[in-house]
Structures are given as C-alpha cells and as structure tokens.
C-alpha cells in the first residue's frame, strides 16, 4: 500500500470516528487514534522498505567452461535491465565441469536454497534442473539448448516451468559438415568423440546418420566416459585412421577441448565444432550461434518472468544470429589454405 493510500484510509477513518462518537469520548480517545494512525503508517512503511530491499537469488547451473560466456552475456543484459548484483540480485554460480553426479547435486542444492530462478547453459543442465525443480514453483530459464525437444512439448509454449532459447545446434550439424567439405574436400573418415551416456547422445547420433552420408562421410563414434578419459582417448584419433574430427555440443567432450585441439594439430586433422568459443580456443571451424548473444536474449525472458510472466506461456526462442567462424592460426598449423570465397563469407576469424 502506498503512503498516499495509507493517509487516505487514516483520514477517512478519523472523519468517520468524529461523526459517530460522543464529544467526551472523542476527546479521551483522540490520543489513541493518533497513536493507532502512526502505528499503521510505520508498519506499512516498514513492509514497503522490506519489499524494496529484497534481493533476488538466481542460481546458474553450468556444465562446462565453454558454456560460461552465455551466463556472462546474461549478467550483462540483466544489469542493463536494472538488476544490480549485490543490490537487488545475487548470483549463485555452479559449474559441474562435465561431472553428472556433481551436476545433480548442485541442482538440488539450488532448489533446497529456494532460489528465485535457475539459469542453465546447456540441454544437459536444463534437463537436470527440470528434474530437480519438479513440484516446485522455481522457474528455469535455459540460455542455450541444442535439443529443446528433450525439454518441451512444442516451441509455442513450454507448458511447464521452463522457458528459454534454442541454440539450433542439432539443426546446424549438416551445415558444419558442408563447410568442412568445402575446406577439406578429401575428408571422408571423421572421428566424433561423444559421451554415450549423455542427454543428447541419441539425438546427436540420429542427426549425424541423417545428414552426413549424402556428403560422403563415414562418421565413427569415439566414446568418452569421463573427463579423465579424454587424455586417454584423444591419442587414438590419428591421421592413419581418420581424415577429420567433429566435436558435437557434448558437455563432457567439450570440457576436454585442449586435448582435442592438441591432437588435431599434431595429426594435421581439421577439427569442426558445434561451439563458437571452441574456434577461439583452437578448433578450425564452426557455424553456430553466439552464446554471449544467447545469454543476453535469455535475460529478457528472465526479466519477464521475474515481473510476473509464466514460463509455461512463453514461446521457445531461436537465435537472433548464426555465425561462420574460422581459426586461421589452426588452418596454417595443419597446412590448410582457406579459399578466398570462404573468407569473404566468414563472420569471425581468430588468429
């Protein structure tokens, strides 16, 4: 209740009191009325101040370092929208770094802490958050999901406590292989490191089987079961057995990016990736959404929800832009010359 409304109520009450009570009784009770009026105003003001000073807690559930820039974009846009860290919002940042057990524990901790919202940066993180928040009123906003079909019934409305942005990662798989063919036409045998227990595994394999045979590729799965596994598995990918490497948006595989890049350069194999940030870190190419931009896009959704919108009523959004990115230093290291016509189409280059 506003100060003006409180004042109006007290004034009307005092006027009504003067009309219906005897003069003698009024005189004796006037001090009591004044005290009561002041008490009402002070209590209301105290409640208003408490509400104004409430600090929202937003939990961030990340599954790999490579997805972290989505949350950085989110925080930056939230600041622009008026959410100042330490003043009216607090962020509880968690990163499982590819560990599924740790991820489940972190999600449950956020629920137990009764956070106001959980923000995720991958399909794996979102599925885990959805399971942890089942039966609660905690909204989950996913800043990037390569496979939203795992999360919602349709793109029009989620019908649940989930809302967010699709990275369109699966849909762009064929395009990445087409680019690899343009850059390295002789590539036929492709190694694909992947977690067979991952949330996206079946969808990734189905998309690969559908999109790559027509391009003349034979894609072989190289299974990775833990982060520690990466250093053991990566050396098995050699130029004797393969012509190139493709890294899907797999949280566990992505956490070992340095090993895959090191092996690709050592064996002079082109390495295509599903993540823009991985090109900056040494992969040769990608055609993908910008996770920082996705984070900013997701902040607008979060703002709507924090102001009263229901996640179930919000449509799943698509990326505002898709970028072609190349790492020219890596191209030189593996002895690959980038055709001029491809360079002219490139949105971002890293050296």
Summary of predicted features, one role per range:
Residues 1-351:
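Short hydrophobic alpha-helices and adjacent helix-cap/hinge residues
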